[in-house]
Amino acid sequence: MSETKIDKKIRRIHAMERKWWHNKVAYQIYPKSFYDSNGDGIGDLPGITLKLDYLKELGVDIVWISPIYSSPFADQGYDISDYYQIDPCFGTMDDMDHLLKEAKKRDMYILMDLVVNHCSDEHEWFEKACEDPDGEYGNFFYIEDRKEGELPCNWRSYFGGPVWEPLPGHPDKQYMHVF
């Protein structure tokens, strides 16, 4: 009997090298609503640390944390204004170091959600692009000349309205934002 297409595919799948995460259970946490350790109404990094034993009991191996970086929170924290800073509402870098240390003690991994598709309009690069749209940082974004009544495309923003907005400080320019 000859090998079918499905048999070949199954054989290839079984022959694939297994990676460390293939047999792990991951649990995504939106920190703001997970566990509030200090009673301010906002979940935080110490709250995640306090619940590591509970998560381990559930069989969780990987804790995937949604963005905790500095943000104006126009997009639930996915509009990051500083990738190097933890937003104070979630804690400090020391809190993050403590979480990592405690997770390691439990043979757990921490996976950070890294949003590289877009940033906040308060991010340093966007602010520099607004200062000089034809400069280095202007090339990091889709910035086009603005013609009254015309848009480069008819795409809609995820939150409604066109994806094109006037570039702050430059009425003759427009920038594209999907969110």
Describe the function of each predicted region.
Residues 2-7, 12-179:
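Acidic/aromatic-lined carbohydrate-recognition and catalytic surfaces
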